Design a protein with these regions (language model features):
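A short, conserved, highly charged catalytic patch centered on acidic carboxylates
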Residues: 1-85, 92-116
Length: 116
């Protein structure tokens, strides 16, 4: 049985593959990394053809409201991972963020994979 967060994660993977045309081989799920010496775990990342992380995604349960605390968590993770795009989703609402030159900007959507 899927947890609520896992249901969101599986649907985001489908969105990445079907809508954004991300090759499945360029998607990684739940891998550990360190932020300032602390062990953390991302939900989903997308790699470019050179193996660089270009999209960092944090999934929440549909019961969790997306708020500034959730965005801050994603931004802190990105200090280490340095993705160009961030996505936060609870399956009901999605927030897309572009990261460029040290600035974060909320955007309407993430471009298809071939445009990244």
């Amino acid at each position: 049985m899927l947890t609520a967060e896992e249901w969101v994660r599986q649907n985001i993977i489908l969105f990445l593959h079907k809508d954004l045309k991300v090759p499945v081989s360029h998607i990684a799920v739940e891998k550990g990394f360190k932020v300032k010496g602390l062990s953390k775990r991302f939900d989903i990342v997308v790699f470019d053809k050179k193996g660089n992380i270009i999209i960092l995604i944090e999934c929440k349960s549909p019961k969790i409201k997306l708020n500034q605390k959730s965005i801050d968590q994603l931004v802190i993770y990105n200090l280490e991972l340095n993705a160009s795009y961030l996505m936060l989703s609870n399956g009901l609402k999605h927030i897309f963020i572009k990261y460029q030159n040290g600035n974060f900007e909320i955007i309407d959507d993430i471009p298809v994979y071939s445009k990244l």
